[in-house]
Amino acid sequence: MMVSLFSQFDSPWLLNIPLVLLALIMPWKLFVSFGPSWAGTRSSRLVYATMETLMSQVMQPLNKLGFRWVVLFSSLMLMLMTLNVIGLFPYTFTPTTQLSMNLGLAVPLWLGTVVYGFRNHPVIALAHLCPEGAPNLLVPVLVVVETLSILMRPLALGLRLTANLTAGHLLMHLISSAVLGLMELSVMLSGITLLLLVFLTMLEIAVALIQGYVFAILVTLYLDENL
C-alpha cells in the first residue's frame, strides 16, 4: 500500500481516540521539576544561562512596561523549541506542523498586542495606519494597505512556522527513503546519502530552535509597536 508523503503530518489516532493532546502534554514530562537539590546542578545553570541570553535578545526592543510579558514570551519560546525538536525523533508527531495550532497561538497573541495598543494608546495606534509625511491623495490607499498588512501578520506568523518545519520534515523523509533505496544499488552511494541525512538532521535541529526564537521575537516586535 502506498502511503502519502504528507501522512506523517496527520494527527495520530489510537482506537478512534485522538492522540494530539498526548503529543502536546508529553514533552512537559521530560522537564525535571525545580527544587533545592536541582537548583545548583550543571544542567540547571546551563538552562538558566541559555534562557537568560535568549530572553535578553527577545525583550531588548521593549521598554519597562513590556517586561510584564516576559513570562509569556519565555514560556512560548520554550514550548515551541521543545515541540519542534521532539518532532524530529522517529515515530513522533509534530504539533507545530499543523497550521491550526500555529494560528491558534499567533492570532490570540497578535490580537492581544493590537487590543492593548488601541486601549491604552488609541491615537498612536491609529497613527501607524498612515506614515508621516504621506501625500494627501495617497492617505486612503496607505490606510487600506497598512490595515491589510497588520491583519496579515498572524497568518504570516503561523505560515512561517508551518512551512519551515514541514519543508524540513519532507526533505528528511525523501533523503531517508533514498538511503534505503540506494542500499540495493551501491553501499558507498548509500553511505554518502546517509552522511548528507546526518548533516540535514543537524540543520533541522538548528531550524527547530531558531523558529521558536523567531516566533517569540516577532510577537515582541508587534507588542513594541503598541506600547
Curated annotation (Swiss-Prot):
Gene Ontology CC, one term: proton-transporting ATP synthase complex
Keyword DNA-binding: no
Major location (coarse): mitochondrion
A Pfam family hit: ATP-synt_A
Organism: Branchiostoma floridae
Signal sequence range: none
GO BP, one annotated term: proton motive force-driven ATP synthesis
PANTHER family noted in UniProt: ATP SYNTHASE SUBUNIT A
Protein name listed in UniProt: ATP synthase subunit a
Coiled coil residues, start to end: none
MF terms (GO), sorted A to Z: proton transmembrane transporter activity
NCBIfam families: ATP_synt_6_or_A (TIGR01131)
Transmembrane segments: 14-34, 69-89, 98-118, 137-157, 169-189, 205-223
Assembly and oligomerization: F-type ATPases have 2 components, CF(1) - the catalytic core - and CF(0) - the membrane proton channel. CF(1) has five subunits: alpha(3), beta(3), gamma(1), delta(1), epsilon(1). CF(0) has three main subunits: a, b and c.
Annotated InterPro entries: ATP_synth_F0_asu (IPR000568), ATP_synth_F0_asu_AS (IPR023011), ATP_synth_F0_asu_bact/mt (IPR045083), F0_ATP_A_sf (IPR035908)
Membrane topology: Multi-pass membrane protein
Function of the protein: Mitochondrial membrane ATP synthase (F(1)F(0) ATP synthase or Complex V) produces ATP from ADP in the presence of a proton gradient across the membrane which is generated by electron transport complexes of the respiratory chain. F-type ATPases consist of two structural domains, F(1) - containing the extramembraneous catalytic core and F(0) - containing the membrane proton channel, linked together by a central stalk and a peripheral stalk. During catalysis, ATP synthesis in the catalytic domain of F(1) is coupled via a rotary mechanism of the central stalk subunits to proton translocation.
Keyword Transport included in the entry's annotation: yes
Keywords per UniProt: ATP synthesis, CF(0), Hydrogen ion transport, Ion transport, Membrane, Mitochondrion, Mitochondrion inner membrane, Transmembrane, Transmembrane helix, Transport
